[in-house]
Each structure stands twice: as C-alpha cells, then as structure tokens.
Amino acid sequence: MKAPAKSSGSSSPAVSTPAPSAAPDPGRKPGEHGELDLFSLLAEHEHEQVSVYYDPSTGYRGIIAIHSTVLGPALGGTRFWNYQSDRAALIDALRLARGMTYKAAVAGLNLGGGKSVIIGDNRTPRREALFRAHGRHVESLKGRYITAEDVGTSTSDMEYIKAETNHVTGLIGRSGDPSPVTAYGVYRGVKACARYRYGSDSLAGKSVALQGCGSVGYHLAKLLFAEGAVITCTDIDPQRVKRVVEECGAKAVAPDAIYDVRATIFAPCALGAVINDDTLQRLQVEIVAGAANNQLAEDRHGDELERRGITYAPDYVINGGGLINVNAELHGWAPERARSKAGEIYDTLLRVFEIAREEGVPTYRAADRLAEQRIAAIAKVRRNYV
C-alpha cells in the first residue's frame, strides 16, 4: 500500500537524548551494529508514527505504533507483555499495527491501524497507576489512536485508561469483552474454509487441533463442539485446558505436541509466529484457521502452506470480530449488529479464496490485495482539500 510517510513522534516526560559521541558513518548500513534502527523499521511497511513514553513514578514503559490513518483513526488494543528486549516490543507493535490497518480495511470499517504495547510483567499489582500512565500516553495523541483490550489486559484496565482519556473502547457496561464476538467470527471463518475446501461448511465430525484455550479459544471451542467437531486442545495454563476438556469433551496434549496432531483443522488462538520452518514440517492438517495475530513467522511460510496444499485463512481476516466489536461501541451498535457483522467474515474469506484462485497467489497475498484496493481508493478521495 502507498500512503504518505509521516515523522515518528515521541513523548517521554523524563527522558533526554544524549548527543551522539561521533558523527554517523555514511558507509554504515542501518542496523548493522545492532541499534534500534527506528526509521528503517518504520519505512519497511510505511508506518506513520511511533510514540514512546516513559513514566518513572510507575515504571511504565510504553510504545504506541500507528500504521495508517487513511480510513480513519488508528484503532488497536494494548498488549501487556514481558518482552525480551525493547526492539522485540517495537517490532511486535509495528507488525500488529499494520495488521490492524488491513483488518479494518477488509472488514469494511472506517478505521486505521494502530497498536500499543506495555513492556513488563503483567502480573503487577500496580495496575491502576500503570494504566493511567498509559491513558495519558494515549491522550497525548489527541484521537489519532484509540485503544482497547488485548493480550495481558482486561476490561478493568480499560476503565483505568478511561480516567485519563476518552480514546478507549471495550469498557465495562458497553461492548465489554470482545472475545465472544471474535470467536464467533473465527467460527464463521472456519466454516468458510470448509465450504471452500470440501463444498460444505458443516464441521460435524471434523477434527480440530486448538492451540490456546484462553478467552477466544474457549468460546471457539464451545461453538465447534456444538456443531459436532472433535477437539484436541492445549494451553500453557492447565486450568484453561481443563475447562475445555470438561465442557467440550476435548483431548488435551502438551503445548509443543499440538503441532504433531493429525487433524482436519489447526486453529492457532494464542500468540503469533506459530507457522514457521519447524512447525511446517510437523503439521498434519488441511486447513489453518484461528484467532492468533501474525500467525506466519514470515511471508514465505504462507507460500509454503500454499505449496503444501494447506488452506490458510489469513489471520487479520478471520480474527476481525474483536475489531468489529469495539467499532460497534464507537458507533453505538447493538450487540446483535456486531455479531451479525462478524458473521460476514464468512463471505469475506470466500472472496479472498476467489481472488487467490483467479490470480494464482497465496491467500495471504490475496487478502492484502483486497485490503490495499480499499485503502488506495480512499487515499485518492482524501487527497483533495475540503
């Protein structure tokens, strides 16, 4: 996609940047000495802005990445994770923000893509102060970015953010937990995959290897079980696994063993990059369709899925229900309308599969093209001053 590049923003109320000790070497390649290489990372996928904020009183360290505001304000959740490095946190925020742009575009929403990450242990008891600091960070962007719940955060955390900014969704008493709507959209997407692959969208008797039994994975398991699917599940939390086993008649396996399960469908519903060089050698499935973000470690792994004859539901298409749910809150939609809109993921995926077949490209590229067509069309409209 082609969008005008913008400068990187930075807000940091207790951080100063020292002068460089030496002039930059014009012959040095960006990033070759291991520095953060911020602008190269921004330019790679044409992100508009990154804002970094540090609050010494709470220990808050946060990054907000805005990929695109062509279709509207950037919306994306806040992820609270103990990253191995600041660079890993930044790259995660950038990838997730780009995914949100494309997710909003293919879902037909008037929103751009953004994401925020808080670096640290999400088991901290100091949640109010920490999330109020994050709320001030969000507020500093003056509506260019709207946040919501994500991995490691909750609706209660969103209430703390609300004390400092109105640019937050997923609040208690409003749209609330997006997991049920996200799971319903994924369920409809799985059925679309079955329709494309087998000519029928029935999941009765289909075997599903479910990776992740958290909020979305649990609700998805219930929907799959209700239709007669046979589930094998895993999660790093034994209590989550126990609930799915007891309520959905699932078989449990160790976390790493899920890749070796022979099944019709692999449904990744935890963290990303699970389709990689190692797991591709182990998967024994015909369909990959789940709620996790950034499922492909690299684009070439999507090419390899295609080469192996595995039908892949692009992650940002099939997991768009959560974004649809928070968009419903922004516009005052009834819950039934949000669920109905999430159900349209079925038709969107069939369109993606059609483009892939017609153009002879992997499904992840077909999804990108569908999103980019809409973004480019609106960018042309908005270039005129009114």
What are these regions (language model features)?
Residues 104-110, 144-149, 198-207, 255, ...:
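Flexible, glycine/charged-enriched surface loops at secondary-structure junctions
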